[in-house]
Amino acid sequence: MCIRDRLGIATKPVVIGAYTMLKLCRFTGEKKAEDFIGDLTAAYQELLKECQKQQIAWVQFDEPALVRDMDAQDVELFHCLYDAVLQEKGNCRVLVQTYFGDVRDVYQDLTAMDFDGIGLDFLEGKETVRLIEAYGFPADKILFAGLVNGKNIWKNHYEKTLQTVKGLQEKNISVVFSTSCSLLHVPYTLKHETKLPKECSAYFAFAEEKLTELQELGAVSYTHLR
């Protein structure tokens, strides 16, 4: 029996991506990142095979290192890793998630690869909108749009966010509304902050409130922007 049936949970594993993993490693002696490509891709391939056995629909690989400056050698390394890993995705759909910036140095390569979803930061990713306008976004992929700030405690500026959403919808891009990064950076909820003055808390949105913002933005965009 798979995990989904045994626990009644349709989980989505979130794993540090292979490229970011290598970029965080320190190499000693004569070893370098390229020497570990084979072993690392084999490990990620096994992970995807196990996810297929467990009937997992989506697997998320976090690749924040993609927002850093990348040269041709870095882009080639990314290709070497994922061209191999994605061969074993089978029925699993793979989301590559980026955050804390934009992917200007690898956008065209990223969108051409066999990912099913691509997560982009629309807040700290200053070039994200321009990249989509300049190069488009593939019709066969889902854009996980980081529209609600996952790092700070402030409420979302709905009007500004909905303008971004409208631009994406006009391009007929399949969009999932998301936070710009994990919500581990913010407090859990405002519900128990009973000692905060209302004139202050009125401007705050913690983790639970940010999820509500995503729901509200989705409802408004579906109702009024179509």
Q: Where are the regions that the model predicts?
A:
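Conserved, mostly hydrophobic/aromatic
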Residues: 4, 51, 63, 110, ...
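N-terminal small/glycine-rich loop or linker at the start of catalytic domains
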Residues: 7-33, 183
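Catalytic-face loop-and-helix region of soluble metabolic enzyme cores
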Residues: 109-205, 220
